[in-house]
Amino acid sequence: MTTTNRLRIALQKKGRLSKDCNELLKQCGVKINWNEQRLIAYAENMPIEILRVRDDDIPGLVFEGVVDLGIIGENVLEEEELGRLARGEKIEYKKLRTLDFGGCRLSLAIDRDRTYNGVQDFVNSRIATSYPNLLKRYMNEKGVAFKSTLLNGSVEVAPSAGLADAICDLVSSGATLEANGLKEVEVIYQSKACLIQRAEPLSAEKQALVDRLLTRIQGVQQAAESKYIMLHAPKDKLKEITALLPGVENPTILPLANDSARVAMHVVSQENLFWETMEQLKEMGASSVLVLPIEKMLA
């Protein structure tokens, strides 16, 4: 259990999630004076304490109530869950939300010159991985018997070093696999970063702060996914244009000076294919179309 009055959050000290976690807190208005030599940092403007730890330590810290919150990759979280379940250990936590960074996939990869016919090719193969529990679950579901070789780093070198016939490792772009003469053949798990909370209830003050942070995180993520669009539109095309621009709320419609046939339209939209959308807007008679990024948003 935590004894501090501060909300205690565990973050990855180094690695692929560290920078994104720090940036998320910054965008949420949490001001932290980071010191690379210290493993504990404090917010200047909120009662928040940050513990900077190894990523695979974060699930256990949350499960055991040492920290109140943790940001962790879903792959690490589920790997730890499966391991604890296999040992008959109790697991309790709350998953608050998936975050919009840390995207990757856990994949099987083989020598790039090897022919691949399907997952049955791995029968009785030696597979090197840092995620033995996720790999075992997948192979059990496929009915494939194999031998797992546990490596905690540099998994890609296992085939060339004669340690394994294949690997199961995290993939983002695939460049590391290619550089080591490997090719991706099966995706076994898709992952993003997520925010988790200890199962034991927090104090009213801490829970209120968690709720504030969740609202801000939602605003940051919505802003990143949305655009603020301003345009001039023919009045007789408003229905079609509104349907083309799915908004968070109804659009704002304003009259135009000296133009009774057209109006100004403002909308916050999550439309992604925007070049195609702009071309369609033009075909509908829209003009002066402006697309602006949104820094923060509370819907």
From Swiss-Prot:
What EC class is this? Answer: transferase
The protein's matches in InterPro entries, at most eight in alphabetical order, are given as: ATP-PRT_HisG_long, ATP_PRibTrfase_cat, ATP_PRibTrfase_CS, ATP_PRibTrfase_HisG, HisG_C, N-reg_PII-like_a/b, N-reg_PII/ATP_PRibTrfase_C
Q: Which domain of life is it from?
A: Bacteria
Q: Which cofactor does it need?
A: Mg(2+)
Please name the Gene3D superfamilies in this protein's record: 3.30.70.120, Periplasmic binding protein-like II (3.40.190.10)
The metabolic or biological pathway listed in the UniProt record of this protein is: Amino-acid biosynthesis; L-histidine biosynthesis; L-histidine from 5-phospho-alpha-D-ribose 1-diphosphate: step 1/9
Q: Which GO terms describe its biological process?
A: L-histidine biosynthetic process
Q: Entry's Pfam families?
A: HisG, HisG_C
Q: Where in the cell is it found?
A: Cytoplasm
Q: What is the activity-regulation note?
A: Feedback inhibited by histidine.
Task: Give the GO cellular component terms, alphabetically.
Answer: cytoplasm
Keyword Manganese included in the entry's annotation: no
The protein's annotated catalytic reaction(s) are: 1-(5-phospho-beta-D-ribosyl)-ATP + diphosphate = 5-phospho-alpha-D-ribose 1-diphosphate + ATP
Keyword check for Metal-binding: yes
Enzyme Commission no: 2.4.2.17
Per UniProt, the keywords (alphabetical) are: Amino-acid biosynthesis, ATP-binding, Cytoplasm, Glycosyltransferase, Histidine biosynthesis, Magnesium, Metal-binding, Nucleotide-binding, Transferase
**What is the predominant subcellular site recorded for this chain?**
cytoplasm
Q: Name one GO molecular function term.
A: magnesium ion binding
PANTHER family (UniProt xref): ATP PHOSPHORIBOSYLTRANSFERASE (PTHR21403:SF8), ATP PHOSPHORIBOSYLTRANSFERASE ATP-PRTASE (PTHR21403)
- Homology family: Belongs to the ATP phosphoribosyltransferase family. Long subfamily.
Role, per record: Catalyzes the condensation of ATP and 5-phosphoribose 1-diphosphate to form N'-(5'-phosphoribosyl)-ATP (PR-ATP). Has a crucial role in the pathway because the rate of histidine biosynthesis seems to be controlled primarily by regulation of HisG enzymatic activity.
Query: What is this protein called in UniProt?
Result: ATP phosphoribosyltransferase
Species annotation: Actinobacillus pleuropneumoniae serotype 7 (strain AP76)
Q: State which gene encodes it.
A: hisG
